[in-house]
Amino acid sequence: MPSFVLWTFHLCSQWFQGLTDLLPHIPDTQTVNNFASQTGLLYPGGMKYSKIASWVCIPLLTCRGVDATNSADGGSELQLNESPFSKNWQVLGPFEIGTRESSWGADPLEAYGGFQTLQYDPKASFDSSLALNGLANWSMASTHVNSTANPPETILDINLSPDNLTSLQEVYGWDAKQYQAWARGTLTVSKSNSVVALYTDRIWEYRIDNKSYFGGDFFGFRRAPLLLDLSPGTHTVDLRVVRDVRALGAVGEPFINVTLIAQELSKTLIVDKKSILVADVVENRLISPHASVTLHNTMGNPVDVAARFSLKMLNNNVKLEEAQSRAIGFTIEAKDKINVPSSVSLYFEYTTPDDSSVQRTQTMTITFTRRKLPEVQQNTFMLPGGVVSYATMRPPTSLECNKDKSAKLPVLLGLHGAGQAASDEIIRTMLDGVSDICAWTLFPSGVTPWSGDDWHTWGFADLQHSVRALNDYIKYSGWTGVGLIDGDWIIAGHSNGGQGTWYTISHYPDKIIAAAPVAGYTSIENYVPYSMWHNTDSLLASTFYRARQDFKHEILVDNFAGIPVYQQHGASDDNVVVYHSRLMHRLLQESGSPSKYHEVPGKNHWYTGIMTSDFLKDFYRTYVQRPNATDLLPQRFSVTLPPAGHMGTRGGIYVDQSHTPDRVGSIEVERGMANDGVWKLKTRNIRRFHLETSAIRSHVPLYIQIDGSRFTVTPSNSTTTWYTQDAAGKWTSGGDSWRTISQRYGRQAGVNAFLRTEAPFTVTAAAQETRDLALQTCRNLFQYLSADCIISYAVPTANSTTATSPAGNNVVILLGAQPNGYTAGDSAISISARSLDIKTSQGTTSYPFEPGLGAIFIRPLVNERLELVIWGSDMAGLQQAARLVPVLTGVGQPDFVVVNKGTPLKGQGSLYAAGFFDSEWKVSAASYVS
């Protein structure tokens, strides 16, 4: 009998932790049960299998241990065409576009009715601020086929360099290398009764036969293709091409290589074998039980994947809607933990609504990578959003580190740059020069090669849980060496990881012992300017600026004063120019906590040994010797909360609420001497905070004096004591009774707070015509964040804001007047029979229904959850609002936005309203409501 029958497969759910044994499919059930009992797989009184079947997998994350840029599966179940796209494409451009502006619309061809209404005419011209004589014309571009790729790739090369680029760049910098255009070609489908899986690297928006699709695959993840049921023949493809410097860089000519793949698939449930994510086997032990794989539903019906045996569980099935892709998570665990086979084979069983018979997918084989203990290893773990992620790591194995087995060592974090995966060899080996370091070396994935959202809300949650997963590693790997201090981090990162280092130490400073940002940029708007954005009202423009300030680390330097910082940057870096590091070095000097700064002559952005230079080796070896550092908090320090921002503790102080999200909140702290025990706090724009004394890296205060009011600190109940300032400026202390649905707090705070979900997202679309948008929303969340998403076509309940189930954040897609199931309650934004209404301190502003009117806004649910409402008076307004679901950094969405028929042309410059909700879910005073 094959060795894999010695294995059991466990169901893994975000909602319950119970594990249930399961064997591979073998027809002779009784023989299997007898064998299992004899070999110890089933213990006396254990489960008897009336049917040995595939396992159900509760939806988790698809984040693979291989480079996600090659996840289109070229297996035998996929019907391939050599080159289904046209050789020649009609191109119209270039036109101006700002940094990450295309999410808002901002398409100049909307002034002519949209590209889809235009026919190729080499004599026609269109006004453009980037083209010669101010006129853009039609041109032709050709494709070539990369037949060595599997599946074959069709590559469309576009180079529409703006006229007089050198002079333009001298004025506007890298923003001058950004432009947009449209391209038209064809796609030929050869087979009937098939589904086309369309992959569109570098494309954010396109049309197929004049039907619009938004999201695409801008970074080339190839995780969630658009699944199309197209008839045989030729189909028109219109691509909106955007050259984004943040994604494509600014070195060399500003060309765009669009990569297209079209696969004709059979109508079934397809296992994407290249998406398999599993932990490594180290010294013959599987170091984590968590695993996942992506399924694509190319059938015309929903698919239920379910267990076929008696099992007590809270959620015993997972559903894929028509044309949906989802990652399916599960656990693998051996009874004989030191006898791991080289591979295991398994499959899924599923049913459809119109056929109760059980069907099965093709078999997939999981082949384990085997490592030795001193090597960098791949570990897997669950995220709160119900997905499986991974990190690579190296335990401290040297004899020097393990002299005292009772010792506990800090975590050394290495954050990768944009477009790289933690499993890439370049990342796995970047700290090999200090492989004997006495720390737990960890390379988080950030969920995706772009670290989710640049190591911010989504990516940082992955970082946090990759650290916590080290405790599980100790359990599963059989580790017997030194322990772990999972609250002491030494962090280093390169490029985007350097920016992630700035983010981490400015937002979660109490976790950091020391930091080394290497060739890191300071913020996205300092990396690529926003000077090409459409002009707009100054109050409206300030709204977008505030929405980006949570990630503008230049204004948050005071948050990490006192933490040792080593900076290194190549003097000849043409990717992230050295100005970024010089600027932060100067700002740290001004804060009174200067960094150590090392500029490497003649070196560019990346070079061999960059992360293990003598300068950085000194950094690592110095600060791994300072675990449990208790002297990092200066006598005087500050807490700076950015406008509409969110952060962890600084000096143990956690700001729960500001008075207004329209400006910075701050607390200046002067610590008294240890025998004095008094901390004096001076606050600005702080409404409520509490102390987490366990996070304080100094003596815990006996008293705190807040703007002159004195309170006794009792460490045992500090986390349940809140200090609150009323409207008159008086400070009081109290319990947690204030935490109700009328208050904004916890996971609801900050921009992109919607991404802080504790379970899979649920997207609800009751109206038939809105279902494609529900699928688009889930596809984009999966494509860009690897997030899991449940689609529901049920009518939202009238009391959805107070419902406690499901546990995650919601998206509700609504169309027309008083949408079925929607209730405004006491919300600041409501939808009546004739208008969209916004309540402010000045009264109620109503926007009567008109073509193109739409809105997107968050509203509170119980238990710190959020609901993202996407609404339109018609489909045009709804589709425009749906573009602003937060999946791409730098777009600058505030808490609410009201779009109109002018938004596709003028983007954010045309909005009726945009702004933020304060701590009581009221529209803030500086919000723009026209």
Swiss-Prot record:
Gene3D superfamilies: alpha/beta hydrolase. It is found in: Secreted. GO terms for molecular function: serine-type peptidase activity. Transmembrane segments: none annotated. Glycans are attached at residues 137, 146, 164, 210, 257, 628, 717, 799. SUPFAM superfamilies: alpha/beta-Hydrolases (SSF53474). Its main location: secreted. Keywords: Glycoprotein, Secreted, Signal. Residues 1-20 form the signal peptide. One of its GO terms (biological process) is proteolysis. GO terms for cellular component: extracellular region. The keyword Glycoprotein applies. The keyword Glycoprotein applies. This is Uncharacterized secreted protein ARB_06907. It comes from Arthroderma benhamiae (strain ATCC MYA-4681 / CBS 112371).
